[in-house]
Amino acid sequence: MNKKIIFLIIALTVTFSNKGLSFERGVCAHFDSYSEDPVVYLKALKQIGASSIRVDYQWNKIERTKGKYVVSRPLVKTDAAINQSSLYGLNNLLILDYGNSLYDNGGYPTTRDGINAFANYTKWVVKKNKGKIKYYEVWNEWKNGTGMPPAMKNTGTAKGYFEIVKRVSHIIKENDPNAIILAGSFNPLTDSDNAWFYELIELGILDYIDGISIHPYSYKNENIQLRTAEANLNAIDQFYDKLTNIANRKTAIYITEIGIPNYDGIGGVNEIESSIFRKKYIKLASERSYIKGVWWYDLKDDGTNKSFNEHNFGIFKANMTLKKNTDENLSLKN
């Protein structure tokens, strides 16, 4: 074989291998709630050194009439961001999530009709976006009831979640074999969340996913030490060791949400402190071979009320001004 061809094959192998093994420095974003064109935010993400974006692609914004699938107005900007992200060196993590008022009264899809409908929505999304999505995360915080009607927040069971993951896993692999499937989105620093996921392991969830997604928020934790980057990740190490023993296998971990707000309430910190925490957390996480990425929550503040935590998680302020950073902590880059 020609030496040049051999060299090219080796070079391509190394390139794609590195891409597959690279540690993601991601950011959660809500493009459809932002005032500007998605390009403004994609450029900002590139500026701070992000390698991935994590976005919702809600079922109820795709299927508004039974059996008909359309990117409705509330998802237009998110869809545009997905289509343009590669121009800014960003991999897409897409969340398949939340209920639909057309099925199961808008609650968790647990009936046969609801599960079939969620599966059909998944198939449409995956076929439409084939080759554009590196990661699919099945639901967001099922156990917590995030995004669900208040009356249904505590009705999601481990068995119900398992059935959804099992069903859509086959659909994703059939229609986009290269996509990485993630599931979980729970907090491994809480006993109840861990018990819930251990039940999922017993049900066999690891046979249907490529990685476990976790949301190890700790800024409000009663154990003050766990609010530090070092202790947070040490606790995740302990969780991973127990997980590996229970499952009798090693499974990749993806931290698809972690953040700390600049607000006046419990666990809130100033902008410099959050920047230092973020820098340290990402660095320490990247040094653990079993952790494949961190997605910071989130890109920009959702509001300006300093008493409300949910308004103050952004790397940028609500007006897209970069928050205060020490020089060495300007971005997500290490």
Q: What are these language model-derived features?
A:
Residues R25-A29, S51-V55, L90-L96, K134-V138, ...:
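Hydrophobic faces of well-ordered beta-strands that scaffold small-molecule active sites
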Residues Y34-E36, T65-K68, R73-K77, L102-G211, ...:
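Active-site cleft segment of glycoside hydrolase catalytic domains centered on the general acid/base Glu
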Residues G20-S22:
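Boundary at the C-terminal end of the N-terminal hydrophobic targeting segment
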Residues F7-T15:
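Bacterial N-terminal signal peptides
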Residues D37-K61, Q84, Y88-L93:
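Catalytic domains of carbohydrate-active enzymes, especially glycoside hydrolases
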Residues M1-I5:
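Positively charged n-region of N-terminal signal peptides that target proteins for export
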Residues A252-K333:
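Substrate-binding cleft of secreted/luminal carbohydrate-active enzymes
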Residues A81-N91, K128-I133, R167-A179, Y208, ...:
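A structural motif corresponding to the C-terminal end of an alpha-helix
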